[in-house]
Amino acid sequence: MSKRLLGAIRSFGDPGTYVQVLRLLHYYGYSHVQERRKLTLGTGSTIAPNISFANAERITIGADTKVGERAFLWAGASTGRITIGDHCRLGPEVFVTASDYGLMPDETIAHQTRNERDVVIGDDVWLGTRVFVGAGVEIGAGCVVSAGSVVTRSLAPGSIAAGSPARVVRRREDYAVLAERPDEPEAVPSVSAAHES
């Protein structure tokens, strides 16, 4: 018998093989699996298997975008959309929501009115680990938001923001060069080359 055949026979006898099958069956039962089928996912984009989606039919993720482990993408129940551009990176445990609640003085917390507003994240945006993005926020193309930041107001393109609430701490000087790059990979200038010229 060949080594390959013996390896396959050993794999079928290994309890770990069946544990993986059970994990897949368990994963299939999660509600976010059905939600994942509803979202619009661009070419070459990847999302971690343990993301929480709400109302995914109102979520659009562009091409070549990566969404990290345990992220939350919660669109509004009726109108609030989440749109994420191309070439974005969302770190682990990022939370993006297109709805929040009011604080009406004569209503209990359980009966507050839900406010839904679209969230737009432009192309080439990097959101660090545990960034929160609230309803109605627009993050311009080329922005970088540091880990743990709370974004409650829109950010202009090329901004680097940090804090709670997030504030612009500087701008990407290289962003004008990167934004004008052609689609062909071989013609894309390096960041260091852009600084030398």
What are these regions (language model features)?
Residues 129-144, 149-153:
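Beta-rich strand-turn-strand
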Residues 1-37, 43-44, 87, 100-104, ...:
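Terminal amphipathic alpha-helical/low-complexity segments used for targeting or macromolecular assembly
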Residues 29, 51-137, 164, 171-173:
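Flexible, glycine/small-residue-enriched loop-and-beta-strand segment within the central core
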Residues 157, 162-165:
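Acidic, glycine-centered active-site loop in nucleotide-sugar glycosyltransferases
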Residues 92, 147, 157:
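Residues that flank catalytic or metal-binding motifs in active/ligand-binding sites
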Residues 34, 38, 44, 52-54, ...:
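Generic structural signal for beta-strand residues in well-ordered domains
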